[in-house]
A protein has these predicted regions:
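Intrinsically disordered, low-complexity regions enriched in small/polar residues
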Residues: 79, 85, 129, 136-137
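Flexible, low-complexity junctional segments that flank or bridge functional domains
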Residues: 121, 125-135
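Conserved functional hotspot residues or short segments at active or partner-binding sites
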Residues: 2, 6-119
Length: 137
């Protein structure tokens, strides 16, 4: 299930999935998940979380899913806000992936997707147009 789940020992699967579904993300649904990983992080532990389902690829804004997950974590588990707990060495990689430190710094202030959404989406349509010639399907 790589890239389909978000789980941790301290998450309540029902509350987490309900919170994420309450955001009304178009083309995306979340279902509660209870698993016991047999390798990697939390190996052998009973953990809970969500599984992500894409219901409409044309409407889903896939690049925002992780931001909504971080928002839900901050709302349900304020002592676990993602950037508050992250190793600061990891901030640089996040900033590189996002193109600047603006996303991280702004999101950290509010823990709300709405605070970064316009900035995050500002070049999306231009990118879609420029990249069309490289699509294989």
């Amino acid at each position: 299930l790589p890239f389909q789940i978000a789980c941790a020992p301290w998450i309540d699967a029902i509350k987490f999935s309900d919170k994420l579904n309450s955001y009304g993300m178009e083309g995306i649904r979340f279902r509660p998940l209870h698993i016991k990983p047999f390798f990697s992080v939390f190996s052998g532990e009973d953990i809970q979380g969500i599984q992500i389902f894409i219901t409409n690829y044309k409407k889903a804004v896939l690049t925002e899913i992780n931001f909504y997950i971080m928002q839900a974590i901050a709302e349900l588990y304020p002592d676990r806000a993602v950037f508050d707990k992250a190793n600061t060495n990891r901030h640089r990689m996040f900033d590189l992936v996002c193109g600047s430190d603006y996303i991280r710094k702004t999101f950290t202030q509010t823990n709300k997707v709405s605070s970064i959404q316009n900035f995050w989406r500002k070049d999306a349509e231009t990118f879609k147009e420029l990249s069309k010639k490289y699509y294989l399907y």
